[in-house]
């Protein structure tokens, strides 16, 4: 009876295998029909991101961010050092800056407060540091003092000219570029402001004796400034910045409208580059240090590059999103290809068949072990009968 039951179970297993194969095939066909439809909107959704990203690049190339970089490339590195071209040659390059570029350059040069002085102030201030007379009695002691007084008169004249012009500009209301206002030349103001700088420098050099001599030299310098005309070949290094900031209103807190504060700033500028200045203070940048003016342009270029960098950072996530969408498209297109999909379905079907065959073989071995290895037709012998027969045949047991 048991072999008949075994034969009746095998057709049922085969039918179950066929049903499983049909179910797997239909499920694979459903996946094949669903995945291309799911891949279509993902591809359609990725296209607008790509188009938007391309549009942003085109907008940036049209003058949003590229214009600033082009202006920075045109900006000479030697501006403000005194070794570059004249103001007339540098005006087209300097006027091409944006508004925030001019504000930052004003904050960097606000120690002298000549950021928004008119361009024609250079005509009244020639460089006469080399034309100062030196006495014959003490040439070694008065030579540095004479050069410092020349620089002091230059800076004081800068401070006075800037103090008169800054009062005409309102700090909050934007104004149009005004005509240059030439301040009245006052010798008393120049000597007072330059005298303060002489006192600061004389403490390091000649104490009180050098102050009187420098004061006399100061008057002679004022006379020379009245007589001499503008020297176009030798312009002050600070006036080179004036072509940028004409007509712009300062927005930083460092630039003051009061004239007294500007005179103090001018005096502190005299002390800064010679004594050593404070840490990170504006007084470190004096008019005589040409190299420091070159370094002043570095923060401007860095700050101007910051909006462009932030724009690039804003667009980088968009680029990453495009890459993520392309990965989704890649996975969807991977299963949407007919050859790859057929291979996956075939592998799944073969795996199911192998699993079913293994289960059937295990079940067959378990049933064969339960039946036993003995023959079903042979009668079983009891151990009692065998022992009795052996005892009957054994005669030595009775002896």
From Swiss-Prot:
Superkingdom per UniProt: Eukaryota
Biased composition (Basic and acidic residues): 67-77, 215-226
Gene assigned in the entry: Sdc
Protein's name according to its UniProt entry: Syndecan
Location of this chain's protein in the cell: Membrane
Biased amino acid composition, Acidic residues: 191-214, 253-270
Tissues where the protein occurs: In 13-16 hours embryos, expressed in lymph glands, peripheral and central nervous system and basal surfaces of gut epithelia. Sdc and robo are coexpressed in domains adjacent to slit; in tracheal pits and midline glia cells.
Membrane topology: Single-pass type I membrane protein
Transmembrane regions: 341-365
Annotated stretches, region: Disordered: 28-319, 373-399
Deletion phenotype: Flies exhibit aberrant midline guidance of axons and establishment of muscle pattern.
Similarity section: Belongs to the syndecan proteoglycan family.
Keywords: Developmental protein, Differentiation, Glycoprotein, Heparan sulfate, Membrane, Myogenesis, Neurogenesis, Proteoglycan, Signal, Transmembrane, Transmembrane helix
Predominant place of localization: membrane
